[in-house]
Amino acid sequence: MKKLSSLSLLLAVSLFHTAFAAEPATELTVSAAISMKESLTAVARDFENSHAGTKVLLNFASSGALQKQIENGAPVDVFVSAGMKEMNALDQQSLLEPGSRGDLLENTLVLVTPKEVEKIHALGDLQSDDVKRLAVGDPKSVPAGLYAQQALKFTQLTAALQSKLVLAENVRQVLAYVESGNVDAGIVYATDAQASSKVRVAFVFPAESHEPIVYPAAVLKASKQEKTADEFLAFLHSETAKQEFVKAGFQPVSK
């Protein structure tokens, strides 16, 4: 009987520990502009390390695509956009947690070419017959594409380059087109250019050529993890996160 009791106790303790170990972690879903992929992945891991039992699930795409997902009911806790338009649209539909929205980062718009290509050194070189294709994000859903559209209009190159434009689903697709040599050049963020060893920056667009490139962040009203979402949002504004973002080429928001 004693052996049986000991075995039963051992089994009970084992089951308790198994159940405890299998307890699901708090999962936080963060949808963010794909231009933040490397830096936000590092920041999310830092957050997990300082918040035991929390798992951050990252969903990267163009800000416009993420906006549509949220509007269609995707279970998202935190949204970080590469443009104001997408965040404004969600705000106007009362989909954001009141008081949670804030500007996080700024970026710079640049023209990149494959690293070994030397025929483009200035913006005017895009008009050359040797330049056949220029990749930009689709301005309807990609903030970088909208900024590119504004910049080309500002520099009075829209008409001259219209037939050369190749539209991409997001800014990283633009980068991939340039890296592979499928296009002669592309317009991306400075952070995208920094993330690649296969491209070089041929031109930096002046800030006045387009709307300010600001990344707003907010908690979604539908979040079922509001406390953890608030903590993650606060962490995005921390010095620890700022160091990762600056390392990736982002700039803190101008006061």
Predicted regions located by residue number:
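Bacterial N-terminal signal peptides
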Residues: 6-18
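Positively charged n-region of N-terminal signal peptides that target proteins for export
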Residues: 1-4
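Exported/periplasmic ABC-transporter solute-binding proteins
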Residues: 21-51, 55-74, 81-84, 88-105, ...
